[in-house]
């Protein structure tokens, strides 16, 4: 079990570090953060597939265009990797994380139906400063998010989201009323 957290908008590296520190037990092997303009990405790693430091996250493509934080396991990543290698994609790790980066580079959001597994991830594209989040169809890997007036915030657990200074843990009574009305 790994953990991811991050934001796009108002925030700092310290905010990303505080967010991932709240869920550091999800990844005892390494906690790391990166800032990409106004986007902060953080990862708590539990090494399973590729134990090398080359597979540490946040992970970027060699050209730095795409950066990912990923929690989960892609069961068919070896088959996907073979197909990508046939089309000229080079790999430096044996991790399923790197396969996701190359799949996104090749197919964009169209990659999702190709995935078999359990996952939650965020991919930042430096080309247009976009942030793409996805989780598996059944929601086995959690991915919580919140929108404020100046930031989009996400994390594997609510604790990480609430650690961002732009998020207030106050109860929104209007939202509760909407939820309970049927």
Model-predicted regions and their roles:
Residues 1-182:
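Cysteine-centered catalytic environments shared across enzyme families
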């Amino acid at each position: 079990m790994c953990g991811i957290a991050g934001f796009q908008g108002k925030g700092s590296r310290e905010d990303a570090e505080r967010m991932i520190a709240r869920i550091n037990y999800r990844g005892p092997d390494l906690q790391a953060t990166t800032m990409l303009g106004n986007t902060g990405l953080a990862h708590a790693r539990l090494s399973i597939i590729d134990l090398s430091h080359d597979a540490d996250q946040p992970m970027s493509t060699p050209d730095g265009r795409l950066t990912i934080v990923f929690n989960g396991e892609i069961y068919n990543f070896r088959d996907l990797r073979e197909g990508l290698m046939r089309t000229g994609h080079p790999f430096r790790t044996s991790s399923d994380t790197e396969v996701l980066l190359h799949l996104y580079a090749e197919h964009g959001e169209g990659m999702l139906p190709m995935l078999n597994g359990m996952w939650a991830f965020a991919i930042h594209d430096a080309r247009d400063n976009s942030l793409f989040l996805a989780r598996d169809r059944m929601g086995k890997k959690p991915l919580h998010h919140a929108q404020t007036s100046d930031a989009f915030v996400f994390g594997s657990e609510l604790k990480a989201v609430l650690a961002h200074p732009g998020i207030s843990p106050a109860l929104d009574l209007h939202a509760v009323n909407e939820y309970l009305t049927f």
